[in-house]
Amino acid sequence: MPGVPPYYDWIAHHAQRRPRQLAIDDLQTGRKFTYAELDRRTNRLAGALAARGLGKGDRVALLAPNCAEYFELQFACGRLGAIMLPLNWRLTVPELEYILDDATPKLLIHDKSFGQQAAALARARLEIDVESRESGYEQALSAAPPPPAPAALTHDDIGMVMYTSGTTGHPKGAIITHGMVFWNAVNLGIPAMISPTTVQLVILPLFHTGGLNCYANPVLHAGGAILIMRAFEPGLALDYLSDPALGITHFFGVPAPYQFMMQHPKFQGADLSRLVISGVGGAPCALSILETWTARGVPLVQGWGMTETSPAGTMLDGADAVRKVGSAGRPMMHTEIRIVDEDGKDVAQ
């Protein structure tokens, strides 16, 4: 229907219904975007990409620290049917070269801080400089023609490719469809009590599924706000969590940030009373971390998932975190899980 946003484009949906609502606060740069502003920038980026010949099925790589541009690119690609390729900025140039040769993106968008690596990769590129309106990225947005009509997509169309490493060999590209991101938003949104009033502090790398999808995309799906840390620093994170003006209600991390924060001098005096849900995943969480945060009134909600499932699979309620140490929790609402023996046969319940 004309004027109705496609189901996968919740930025456009909220821009129509709550245009003045804060969508993203890029904390260290001071940039804030309402849903209306994020929608306009996303549209301009879609137009800029289309003007460069990108369309359905084409890949666009992004090499950047945490920033709002991750979400601009994700939804701009969605409007074109293109595919986002977030790159791990911790990789060496040869490692990045392998991924780019394998995924064959038509364009590399990179932060100014990775200019040397981007030049060595010798690809068509646009540079982001969050401190300047004269960067190639911002100029491309300013000069962008109107984008084409939104691509007709289904849940099975690819939205992004995320390279993930196993124990051996080169990283392999995990195919992430629009449906996977949508169902993850639903699966996590309900038990994590995510709503339009949710405010999440995002600290995990956005090139990783944990940063993008726990809980950032579910929060944007609900019409809430995400506050992005460019890089995690425990004392600063505790300051943000304590700030009543920010009103942070949700937090997600792997165990290490929780350990770093609880070992920081500011931890005992931090005001954590506004936290509704604090999730932890990505690795087993030590009992000492669970007990310390529970004693501060913040029981950690544990989860299990993997990049290939985008990512949520199971969740263990905070009330059971200490009692059931070592458990991965129960399957999410729209998730089916089998437990099998070494022969692949279902075990008894």
Where are these regions (language model features)?
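Conserved AMP-binding A3 loop
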Residues: 32-36, 159-183
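ANL superfamily adenylate-forming
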Residues: 113-155
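Gly/Ser/Thr-rich phosphate-binding loop
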Residues: 192, 221, 248-253, 262-323, ...
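Conserved AMP-binding/adenylation subdomain of ANL enzymes
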Residues: 182-199, 207-249, 259-260, 264
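Conserved pre-ATP/AMP-binding loop-to-beta segment of ANL
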Residues: 20, 144-163, 170, 193-199
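Conserved AMP-binding/adenylate-forming core of the ANL superfamily
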Residues: 23-67, 71-75, 92-97
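A short helix-loop-beta submotif of the ANL/AMP-binding
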Residues: 59, 65-85, 89-93, 101-107, ...
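ATP-dependent adenylate-forming carboxylate-activation enzymes
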Residues: 64, 85-98, 112-114, 224-244
